[in-house]
Amino acid sequence: MSILAEKLSSILKRYDELTALLSSVEVVSDIKKLTELSKEQSSIEEISVASKEYLSVLEGIKENKELLEDKELSELAKEELKILEIQKSELETAIKQLLIPKDPNDDKNIYLELRAGTGGDEAGIFVGDLFKAYCRYADLKKWKVEIVSSSENSVGGYKEIIVLIKGKGVYSRLKFEAGTHRVQRVPETESQGRIHTSAITVAIMPEVDDVEVSINPSDLKIEVFRAGGHGGQCVNTTDSAVRITHLPTNISVSMQDEKSQHKNKDKALKILKARLYEKQIEEQQLANAKDRKEQVGSGDRSERIRTYNYPQNRLSEHRINLTLYSLEEIMLSGNLDEVINPLIAHAQSQFE
């Protein structure tokens, strides 16, 4: 038996073990264990189906090779072997993809944070443009988008916007969006027709639960203050706005979108946990990168990952040297798969 066949046999054995465990009284009565084992079985279900088919094809090849010695059946066996060898090759390709280590965060919802960087008002306008493109992409994927916090600028853009995106495989599709996005275009306010360069940062933070990120209450500094509107005017007369600082890391989150202090505190704490988890992921990625020839990107917000050049209708993805001359169509349709699919393929190729 080949190394691949042995590996697939062990996966099938584990799948059968999990099936038996999930029907046992001991596991059924333990919700935590039941959930844990159900997730594990679900994670290997696709590879298990492919494994059964592959091992069946190997058995078919073995049987037909034996039939080659039979004068009456040899021609039929030859034809059958041709078909089986093609199936074997196709299954091996599919199985190699399925055996690539799965990111444990791939099925999580995310907090998407877009923040204006260099470029003043134009950067804020592009935050709004890119946010709309992400919303269109979410619509295509049947995901749900909820605005958690937003800070508008004076020209219709955003200084910062944070949204929660929920749906199947959200993190797996959007995790490579983290970093600095640069835009080159002529602003509407530019009378001389000069091209301006602006930049915004994108952060992708998996939504986490209390089990995944545990925070010691004594590590938190919680401040309350009055929420302010545009130009500093007061939008309510109570101390409803909340700022939470995680003292060991100095990561701080402010929230004032809700009128209730309790709701603002709850939102701020969720985003703080997501940021702490994001920090853990970045540290792990940097450690893993040392063992790999190349990486798509660390997810570091300071890393310039993409340029949107409107005069040339060009989108350049710097991490994989991808250039597309369909920028406006991508932004208006939200069809970000044109960029995301090559990024995912590149990341997977690093494990082959």
From Swiss-Prot:
Keyword Protein biosynthesis applies: yes
Subcellular location: Cytoplasm
Modification note: Methylated by PrmC. Methylation increases the termination efficiency of RF1.
InterPro entries associated with the record: PCRF (IPR005139), Pep_chain_release_fac_I (IPR000352), Pep_chain_release_fac_I_sf (IPR045853), Prokaryotic/Mito_RF (IPR050057), RF-1 (IPR004373)
Region feature (Disordered): 288-309
GO cellular component: cytoplasm
Main location: cytoplasm
Residue(s) carrying N5-methylglutamine: 233
GO molecular function: translation release factor activity, codon specific
Any matching Pfam family: PCRF
Annotated keywords: Cytoplasm, Methylation, Protein biosynthesis
Domain of life assignment: Bacteria
Primary role: Peptide chain release factor 1 directs the termination of translation in response to the peptide chain termination codons UAG and UAA.
Family the UniProt entry places it in: Belongs to the prokaryotic/mitochondrial release factor family.
Name of the protein: Peptide chain release factor 1
Taxonomic placement: Bacteria, Pseudomonadati, Campylobacterota, Epsilonproteobacteria, Campylobacterales
